[in-house]
């Protein structure tokens, strides 16, 4: 089987603000809601049809690739790297997500041992800590409330600087606008913290 060349990506500008200037680097993220998955791969692009996905993504070595499932294997190919992801659970096509870029991240584990990570632009890792704490508490609350364990091994939240929606609930990989995730809890209004906690 020939590898599929994905061409349905949001182009992102990833900026470094530590130098008091904006140094742009290219990043990419898919957004398949509501019916854009068909522009990337052949499928019945309807939410009631589910499929299991096995993804391989090849990128330059300096880029990070995040998808719905954890990376199962990485293989160096010249100056590039091929990341192979674990097979997904059955899910709707519009929930498949791939994010490529340069990010910092922080992580924790929920009491059910689910890995939770928040990815931020370089230099803003600590501004993602409030989001990480809210995600952990929320996951633990809903696990107990519904009496069911979150079924995936991880939950990633990625701050994107350009997104046509406020957030996207891709299974295992939630994408949000930066201003909906990145805050300084010591220097933010209660309404800003509330907004972040709702996303």
Predicted regions and their residues:
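Hydrophobic helix-coil surface modules that form long, contiguous segments used
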Residues: 30-37, 42-198
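A surface-exposed beta-strand-loop module
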Residues: 1-24
């Amino acid at each position: 089987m020939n590898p599929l060349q994905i061409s349905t990506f949001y182009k992102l500008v990833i900026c470094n603000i530590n130098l008091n200037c904006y140094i742009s680097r290219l990043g990419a993220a898919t957004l398949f809601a509501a019916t854009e998955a068909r522009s990337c791969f052949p499928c019945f692009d309807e939410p009631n049809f589910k499929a299991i996905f096995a993804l391989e993504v090849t990128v330059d070595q300096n880029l990070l690739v995040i998808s719905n499932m954890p990376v199962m294997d990485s293989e160096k190919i010249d100056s590039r790297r091929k990341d192979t992801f674990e097979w997904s659970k059955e899910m709707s096509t519009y929930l498949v997500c791939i994010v490529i870029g340069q990010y910092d991240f922080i992580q924790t584990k929920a009491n059910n041992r689910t890995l939770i990570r928040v990815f931020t632009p370089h230099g803003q890792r600590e501004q993602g800590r409030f989001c990480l704490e809210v995600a952990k508490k929320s996951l633990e609350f809903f696990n107990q409330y519904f009496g069911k364990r979150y079924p995936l091994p991880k939950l990633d939240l990625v701050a994107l600087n350009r997104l046509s929606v406020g957030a996207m609930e891709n299974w295992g990989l939630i994408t949000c606008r930066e201003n909906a995730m990145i805050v300084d809890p010591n220097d933010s209004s209660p309404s800003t913290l509330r907004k972040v906690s709702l996303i």
